[in-house]
Amino acid sequence: MIQPQTHLNVADNSGARELMCIRIIGASNRRYAHIGDVIVAVIKEAVPNMPLERSEVIRAVIVRTCKELKRDNGMIIRYDDNAAVVIDQEGNPKGTRVFGAIARELRQLSFTKIVSLAPEVL
């Protein structure tokens, strides 16, 4: 469960390393974000000499959470970290690579480009 002020790792090569959630896109009063939700975040740590810089406000989609994700078939998935992929206004990833495993639910939420870049889909 991701809420405002939560720090997340970045799972792509866009130039950001760490994000902090400042808003959850969707209903006006949503408290938590889960896998597949789009958030507004600020970059807390960035790689030098890259297009994205520290303190820049961006959008990101959550791809991994420490909180368990329960599927309809009873399977429970839990990751070791909270991670997100930086996206643009159209929902396309800004990076060209995605690191680590991501959940299959992203394909159903029309983030197919992120799924195709991922090395492993659980």
Swiss-Prot record:
GO terms for cellular component: chloroplast; cytosolic large ribosomal subunit. InterPro entries: Ribosomal_uL14 (IPR000218), Ribosomal_uL14_bac-type (IPR005745), Ribosomal_uL14_CS (IPR019972), Ribosomal_uL14_sf (IPR036853). Pfam families: Ribosomal_L14 (PF00238). Keywords: Chloroplast, Plastid, Ribonucleoprotein, Ribosomal protein, RNA-binding, rRNA-binding. It is found in: Plastid, Chloroplast. One of its GO terms (molecular function) is structural constituent of ribosome. The keyword RNA-binding applies. One of its GO terms (biological process) is translation. NCBIfam families: rplN_bact (TIGR01067). Belongs to the universal ribosomal protein uL14 family. Binds to 23S rRNA. Part of the 50S ribosomal subunit. This is Large ribosomal subunit protein uL14c. It comes from Platanus occidentalis (Sycamore).
